[in-house]
Regions:
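Mixed-charge, low-complexity intrinsically disordered regions
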Residues: 11-13, 23
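N-terminal, intrinsically disordered, polar/charged segments of Gram-positive cell-envelope systems
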Residues: 24-95
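Domain-level detector of nuclease and nuclease-like folds
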Residues: 93-287
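C-terminal motif of bacterial Sec signal peptides marking the signal peptidase cleavage site
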Residues: 16-19
Length: 287
């Protein structure tokens, strides 16, 4: 039972108390002061339950990973492979389980994904890629008109995604689609291939310049560690948006193993060499 359900039950109980009859079922006379005491207790229960509901709403509100001061601080010379290790992981181990959790906000943006990565999840995913579920395109994927409506071509939605050529910091040329449906919890770690476990991320955000950067840096590190040790890894991922933008500026990954061998907080930038991204709607232009 989740916190919201529990809070609703408490609220219902409080309301029920205030509606109780004044005469005991056996016919005993009511005791002076009891009615007032019940009212006071009911009010207290009601206020506590209301606070719990508000706490739940605040915890899952659209502003959790969104503010007006988000900056990617991306410097290609410093972080050519699209990631930066910020320090040790910030993990609250008490909220983790082997059942992965995903969330989204009222702008339909993916907000968090977390879970306890274990050996079974990694081995069950080894050697294959899960197909994406229907309608798994994240916020910022579809082209929008001036009114914020998805652009249609006949009966089909028009995607922001296009095939491009990107000159990587290594000097090599990447030829392919600009965006990926970039997993928060990778499918190689048992993550689900659906809308609220992916963001609209550039190819470089997903795998860096040569397959070992971007999100792939920490994903591969965790996967290899779990395969070798069979230990668990606490893993949480949060994309960060500026205001009401639909595409995240960057993603923060926290990963901490049981034994502390892996203990990192990683910032993964959502940029593309030589291109300017409009994070508000997912469109992009060549510089």
């Amino acid at each position: 039972m989740n916190k919201l359900t529990k809070s609703i039950i408490i609220l219902a109980g409080a309301i029920a108390l205030t509606g109780c009859g004044q005469i005991h079922p056996t016919g005993y006379q009511k005791i002076p002061g009891v009615k007032q005491e019940i009212k006071e207790k009911s009010k207290s229960l009601y206020e506590k339950a209301k606070d719990k509901v508000n706490d739940f709403k605040n915890e899952h509100s659209a502003s959790s990973n969104s503010n007006n001061d988000v900056e990617s601080d991306y410097d290609e010379a410093k972080f050519p492979n699209m990631y930066q290790v910020l320090g040790e992981a910030e993990i609250d181990e008490s909220k983790f389980s082997t059942t992965y959790s995903y969330s989204y906000d009222d702008l339909d943006r993916t907000t968090t994904a977390y879970g306890l990565i274990n050996y079974k999840a990694v081995m069950d995913s080894k050697g294959w890629r899960a197909e994406f579920e229907p309608n798994s395109e994240p916020s910022g994927w579809w082209k929008l008109d001036s009114n914020g409506k998805i652009v249609m071509k006949g009966k089909k939605r028009v995607s922001n995604n296009e095939e491009v050529k990107v000159k990587l910091p290594t000097g090599k040329i990447y030829s392919g689609y600009f965006y990926n449906r970039s997993h928060l919890i990778a499918d190689s770690l048992g993550g689900r291939s659906y809308k609220y476990n992916v963001v609209t991320g550039t190819r470089q955000q997903n795998v860096g310049n040569n397959g070992d950067g971007g999100m792939q840096y920490i994903e591969k590190k965790v996967k290899d560690y779990v395969e070798q040790t069979k230990n668990n890894v606490y893993y949480s991922v949060e994309p960060y948006y500026e205001g009401n933008e639909l595409v995240p500026r960057y993603v923060i990954v926290n990963a901490k193993s049981d034994d502390g061998v892996i203990n990192e907080k990683v910032k993964v930038f959502n940029n593309a060499s030589g291109y300017e991204i409009n994070y508000s709607d997912g469109s992009f232009t060549k510089k």
